[in-house]
Amino acid sequence: MDLFRAFSKPSSKDIAKERLRLILINDRCSMPQEVLEDIKEDILKVLSKYMEINYAEIDVRMTITEKVEEDPVALVANIPVKKVKYNK
């Protein structure tokens, strides 16, 4: 590890690479709201077979996560469950 490089400015190549990465991530995240609503409805349709859902507090969105470098775009769904239906 080169200690001097750790404190130096990033090179223009590294800056350009990071900017391109952010542009590509943003491009992947841009999805029409209608498509996201269709996905949300399909997910809720399936989940409602197995559980009662609090529809007032549902949050489904596309987001960028820094945890995964290869594919940082994620669909995040926060769906509060009231009760699990167990019918066998």
From Swiss-Prot:
Pfam families to which the protein is assigned, alphabetical: MinE (PF03776)
Gene3D superfamilies: Cell division topological specificity factor MinE
GO biological process terms on file: cell division; regulation of division septum assembly
Assigned keywords, A-Z: Cell cycle, Cell division
Entry keyword annotation includes Cell division: yes
Lineage: superkingdom: Bacteria
Family (UniProt): Belongs to the MinE family.
Role played: Prevents the cell division inhibition by proteins MinC and MinD at internal division sites while permitting inhibition at polar sites. This ensures cell division at the proper site by restricting the formation of a division septum at the midpoint of the long axis of the cell.
NCBIfam families in alphabetical order: minE
HAMAP family per UniProt: MinE
Name of this protein: Cell division topological specificity factor
The species this protein was found in: Clostridium kluyveri (strain ATCC 8527 / DSM 555 / NBRC 12016 / NCIMB 10680 / K1)
Taxonomic classification: Bacteria, Bacillati, Bacillota, Clostridia, Eubacteriales
